[in-house]
Amino acid sequence: MSGRLDFNFGSRVYPSWFVGTALGLLVGVAGCSKEATPIAPSSSPLGQEPAQALKLPGLSYWNERRAEGPWSIHVVKIDRSRQDLRLRTTIARNTVLGLSSLSQQIRNVPASAGKVVAAINGDFYVVDQSPYQGDPRGLQILAGEVVSSPGDQVAFWIDAAGEPHAEHVDSKMTVALPDGATFSIRVNEERGPRGIVLYTPRLGPSTRTVGGKEYVLDREGSGPWLPLEPAKTYTAKVMDIREGGNASLKGDHLILSAAPRVAGLNDVAVGSVVKISTATAPDLPGVQVAIGGGNIMVRGGKLQEFQMPSSGAYKYRSVLERHPRSAIGFNATHIFLVEVDGRQPDLSIGMTLRELGQYMRGLGCVEAMNFDGGGSSTLWVDGRVVNSPSNGGERDIGNALVIVRTPTTETK
């Protein structure tokens, strides 16, 4: 396709290559199971856990086959009462930028975090060969660290009290200058022509920007510092100012990067003290895990309606088309990871978002949202990929959500 199309997601404008489901690119070569077991018999009620489901402590998995699609649906059901099961996000290559398969991201989870027992692909991301390939579209918090700021969209997270949420999250992140002026900022993303972005060492070796001014920040005083956490204020001193972009990200320094068209920072000099706020709406104090996604499908136990698209662009029409899908849902007792295979007429044709929402509600979810789908849709359980990715193998993706088992004295 020639030229460049832009999709407008909230307050951000993203090129057509941004949506991982839009193009059949980046196909991995890892092995996948075409005939994952156990399989729920078609005579059982839709969404009901079969007697032969794979049982692990606190977790069950099954593959439900339905002739009426046909559909092949993979479900992981997690007991929320288990103190030894934790959710965690991953990123490719342990940096914001770059892509790797779900299996590779699982291998990169540190042993200290626990043993991964299940995982699913995560947010939409930059898929093309740009300097920011792999950048997640929305919010991501990894072990308490903000690695990507909200993109004015839906996210899933676990609050400090252990309660799951799936709802819209807005960025309220700012930098306050010595003269009192305040500017909105984003974290670890491509800088727009009038944007200000805060880059952390988690991005990669350098900011990859072109032009503008970049302010090297170091800790000032005894307040909080890296890793960057949500719902906090950081006091920083300007140690250096670099022209031209692509500043190195070294040690525990931050880089505040201003595009050439940004006005109002001319009085910021070496030695100036600025304040960085990582506020969001809703606020996320103490959150250890968060990941962005797509539409809310079930809210308060009610199926959400999806309007007929006013545009023929893929972003809009894909909502009403059948594609491979990935989703997360929950109720008072369980969290569900669901993957629906698609684009394989003899196995599974995929689902619309409404069909997926109906299925999630049938599982008992009172809240449910979808993740990136299409060729990205991948579910991993107990050491292997259990679904049949539509491209014939694992696609390299930007991030993922994993379930880890941690050491505990609990013996349930």
PLM region spans:
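Gly/Ser/Thr/Pro-rich low-complexity, intrinsically disordered segments
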Residues: 32-412
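N-terminal secretory signal peptides that target proteins for export/translocation
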Residues: 1-15
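Intrinsic disorder/low-complexity segments in short proteins, especially the signal peptide
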Residues: 10-12, 28-31
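Intrinsically disordered and other compositionally biased segments
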Residues: 12, 25, 98-101
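Bacterial N-terminal signal peptides
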Residues: 16-28
